[in-house]
């Protein structure tokens, strides 16, 4: 439904740049990132149809550039940014932008807020394992197949901060800060927790899980919710606590950003955006739970996506990628529509035979049968 509505809007705007400007003016401050993201996508797709005049394209690009890239209220939504950047780059490629146009502002990073806040156990427990919490914090499909893959290329190090620290370095840094204000009781609880966890390798963790959970509970009680949340995010062996996709498990290699922290942040952010079991639980439960069909989307899934797009934008702006990882890879994985492509299906159902080539069924190569020795000779030819 959402994709169909987006492309229907592309069709409406394809020859109406003035309507695109009017719609943007009316809805640009709407407090719903899901709507504004697709409005920008539709405007971008409409421009890409190539039917706007040079002046029309310029004024639309200028408006979005001023509101999204030159504004102090730049949206922390990685897809909204991507569509808007595409629109300005398209206008630039068409030669409609003046020489003094600040097109450099469209290039990331954009300076969103960092770091994300620590999320306490008390806050997660207050959600009572509702749909959002199960889906994100407790190894649900969204966490494992969407969230983890969207953020697992990022390290724990800020941009321009020098070499990426190891997980062991981060734990030591946290401990040094902890020692400044920790009481003897806090330090004793921390030592007891480390003693239990040092016995737990990846293979024995689940065997020792009851002892580890008991030591964690004692440490949490001793240090309080906020310090325990900081320890969980910055110093714990977080990858042992769930089924994380593509996680780096070595403490002496460049530290990956804590995926458990990312999951918890998305969970809280989705609730902060407005989702609740009381308001939306019954409706969401009535929607078929199938990640491969998209006829109607659960409201909770909408808020999860908004939170994830915000997290990805903030990580892209502020963190170094892990060695060998590509910063552009994240946005490629998250793109979910090509707003310029209006064809929904073709005549080809997989069974029909077409006499003439078309743009979706290219001509078949005419390969004449040849003897085996001729084929082998052809393999060694260096020319077409």
For each of these PLM feature ranges, what is it?
Residues 36-39, 54:
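Surface-exposed beta-strand edges and their flanking turn/coil or helix-capping segments
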Residues 1-30, 38-41:
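Extended amphipathic alpha-helical scaffold segments
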Residues 1, 46-384:
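Long internal repeat-built scaffold domains in very large eukaryotic proteins
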Residues 32-37, 78:
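Alpha-helix N-cap/helix-start positions at coil->helix boundaries
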């Amino acid at each position: 439904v959402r994709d169909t509505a987006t492309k229907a809007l592309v069709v409406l705007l394809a020859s109406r740049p003035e309507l695109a400007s009017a719609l943007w003016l009316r809805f640009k401050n709407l407090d719903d990132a899901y709507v504004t993201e697709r409005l920008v996508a539709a405007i971008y797709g409409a421009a890409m149809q190539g039917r706007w005049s040079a002046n029309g394209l310029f004024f639309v690009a200028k408006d979005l550039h001023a509101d999204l890239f030159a504004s102090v209220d730049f949206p922390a939504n990685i897809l909204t940014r991507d569509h808007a950047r595409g629109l300005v780059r398209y206008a630039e490629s068409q030669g409609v932008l003046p020489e003094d146009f600040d097109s450099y502002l469209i290039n990331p990073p954009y300076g969103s807020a960092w770091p994300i806040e620590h999320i306490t156990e008390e806050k997660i427990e207050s959600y009572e394992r509702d749909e959002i919490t199960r889906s994100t914090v407790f190894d649900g499909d969204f966490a494992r197949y969407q969230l983890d893959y969207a953020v697992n290329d990022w390290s724990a190090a800020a941009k321009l901060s020098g070499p990426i620290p190891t997980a062991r370095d981060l734990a030591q840094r946290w401990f040094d800060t902890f020692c400044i204000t920790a009481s003897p009781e806090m330090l004793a609880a921390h030592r007891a927790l480390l003693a239990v966890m040092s016995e737990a390798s990846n293979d024995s963790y689940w065997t020792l899980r009851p002892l580890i959970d008991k030591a964690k509970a004692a440490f949490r009680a001793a240090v309080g919710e906020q310090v325990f949340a900081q320890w969980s995010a910055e110093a714990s062996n977080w990858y042992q606590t769930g089924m994380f996709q593509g996680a780096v498990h070595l403490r002496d290699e460049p530290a990956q950003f804590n995926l458990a922290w990312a999951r918890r942040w998305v969970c809280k952010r989705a609730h902060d955006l407005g989702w609740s079991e009381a308001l939306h639980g019954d409706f969401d439960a009535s929607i078929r739970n199938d990640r491969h069909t998209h006829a109607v989307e659960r409201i909770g899934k909408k808020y999860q996506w908004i939170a994830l797009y915000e997290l990805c934008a903030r990580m892209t702006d502020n963190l170094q990628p892990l060695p060998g990882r590509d910063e552009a890879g994240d946005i490629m994985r998250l793109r979910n529509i090509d707003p310029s492509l209006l064809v929904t299906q073709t005549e080809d159902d997989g069974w029909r035979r077409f006499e003439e080539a078309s743009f979706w069924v290219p001509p078949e190569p005419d390969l004449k049968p040849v003897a085996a020795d001729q084929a082998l000779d052809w393999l060694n030819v260096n020319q077409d």
